[in-house]
């Protein structure tokens, strides 16, 4: 409830846009540490007195600076309110370090407390009510539980909904959840200290002496990260590579795969047009 209250308080504020976000990601156990270089811009038609960013409430800000100067800010849950006015068209570079554990309670604030905590409640896709305020649900036969993020030595899964990186867009529109809003940001991600594990994210992957990095030729609306002991099978069609990651020993699906590599390439080419 407190996260909804905090978000509604600043819902009508004009927002900045994050043009670029360069991140260096590390983790130890269930704790993560991120150093982020951001470029903010005010594209609105008026000055913004207190630019707002959003970050998972379980992640504490170690430092927040701009061009070597500490910036004052207030924080209410996942809402970070900076005490620094931005004029129309102004760009503001930020250097932010944050660390901690992921608080999954920030995910899917549009769900009622009953739906969020009911482990037998499943959300029906594409079935929002006519007003767009709440998704419809069904009662499942089995109790599947609900996890929206995981950070650990064996496996890590971080989706945009858990606010594992700084965003200028709130995680959900509480008035009308079906209305999605995104920033298109130039993301660059470097993951350190995960030797021997598969590191999966959006973009072009490169290995270096520190770890694995991902860069993108075009701005993206959001970013995910998955780390774990995965095996991979790939096929290349017209210089475009397709890959499947799976748990070790779980390649049973390959035995029933009767298409040759050449036939599979033709099938993919036909689908791509």
Where are these regions (language model features)?
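Extended, low-hydrophobicity, Ser/Thr/Pro/Gly-biased non-transmembrane segments
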Residues: 98-223
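Juxtacatalytic substrate-recognition/specificity segment
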Residues: 81, 189, 213-215, 231-273
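N-terminal, polar/Ser/Thr-rich
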Residues: 1-31, 145, 179
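C-terminal beta-strand-rich structural cap/linker in extracellular carbohydrate-active enzymes
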Residues: 90-92, 217-230
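A surface-exposed beta-strand-loop module
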Residues: 47-48, 58-125
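Short, solvent-exposed loop/turn segments enriched in Ser/Thr/Gly
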Residues: 33-35
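Short structured motifs
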Residues: 18-25, 77-82, 171-176
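Asparagine-centered strand-capping/turn motif at beta-strand->loop junctions
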Residues: 40-44
